[in-house]
């Protein structure tokens, strides 16, 4: 008779859920106050005018308007602002 011994247990077989980070509203898009613009880890993007920053560095609109991306400053930082339509 053919016999097969029990296979050993494995230490694999786990995976974490995706964090769903990234830009949610792109340049030129209309947003309402409270809309999330970017979900990020750290400050890849910085808050400009009419944009708030949450404790997890999520950027969100403080007023209604259009999203505007800009690069400025000596360190070429990326800022996101909301401009009135």
From Swiss-Prot:
<dbReference type="Pfam" id="PF01016">
    <property type="entry name" value="Ribosomal_L27"/>
</dbReference>
<keyword id="KW-0687">Ribonucleoprotein</keyword>
<dbReference type="GO" id="GO:0006412">
    <property type="term" value="P:translation"/>
</dbReference>
<comment type="similarity">
    <text>Belongs to the bacterial ribosomal protein bL27 family.</text>
</comment>
<protein>
    <recommendedName>
        <fullName>Large ribosomal subunit protein bL27</fullName>
    </recommendedName>
</protein>
<dbReference type="GO" id="GO:0022625">
    <property type="term" value="C:cytosolic large ribosomal subunit"/>
</dbReference>
<dbReference type="InterPro" id="IPR001684">
    <property type="entry name" value="Ribosomal_bL27"/>
</dbReference>
<dbReference type="GO" id="GO:0003735">
    <property type="term" value="F:structural constituent of ribosome"/>
</dbReference>
<feature type="region of interest" description="Disordered">
    <location>
        <begin position="1"/>
        <end position="21"/>
    </location>
</feature>
<feature type="compositionally biased region" description="Polar residues">
    <location>
        <begin position="9"/>
        <end position="19"/>
    </location>
</feature>
<keyword id="KW-0689">Ribosomal protein</keyword>
<dbReference type="InterPro" id="IPR018261">
    <property type="entry name" value="Ribosomal_bL27_CS"/>
</dbReference>
């Amino acid at each position: 008779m053919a016999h097969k011994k029990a296979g050993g247990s494995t230490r694999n077989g786990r995976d974490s859920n995706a964090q769903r980070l990234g830009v949610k509203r792109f340049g030129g898009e209309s947003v309402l106050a409270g809309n999330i613009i970017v979900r990020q880890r750290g400050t890849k993007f910085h808050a400009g005018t009419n944009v708030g920053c949450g404790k997890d560095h999520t950027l969100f609109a403080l007023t209604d308007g259009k999203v505007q991306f800009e690069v400025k400053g000596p360190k070429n930082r990326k800022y996101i602002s909301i401009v009135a339509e």
